[in-house]
Amino acid sequence: MLKFTESGLEGVKAELSWLDDLMESKGLIRAGQWDYERVTYDKKFSTIEGTFYLRIQGIAAEGDVGSGRAVIQLMSPLLGKHYYPHGVEYGETEEFPVQVVTKSKALIQDIANMLKTVQM
């Protein structure tokens, strides 16, 4: 697992529908990955070395996700590797391609910069 600490996303709060639009515009998909208290946005990277996912999670600071009216507080982004058929692993021994890490960092920075204009 690679945890992007001090990414500029930790603790940032934004309205759910705005956050959904922003994340989708950057290629991160929420789809069915939510419950009433939290959301998960994923971006898939397919490389020769394998399939990797950038994951940005958040919790509902106000409201609930199911109603579509919530303020989400973001957490540190994670990078994990997908293993068929088990799913995404976030183990400490994972190795990540430099290009995936570089793209993930740039994407996180871009999202953090956009959130500065609307955070609650």
Curated annotation (Swiss-Prot):
<protein>
    <recommendedName>
        <fullName>Uncharacterized protein YlbA</fullName>
    </recommendedName>
</protein>
<dbReference type="InterPro" id="IPR036491">
    <property type="entry name" value="YugN-like_sf"/>
</dbReference>
<dbReference type="Pfam" id="PF08868">
    <property type="entry name" value="YugN"/>
</dbReference>
<dbReference type="InterPro" id="IPR014967">
    <property type="entry name" value="Uncharacterised_YugN-like"/>
</dbReference>
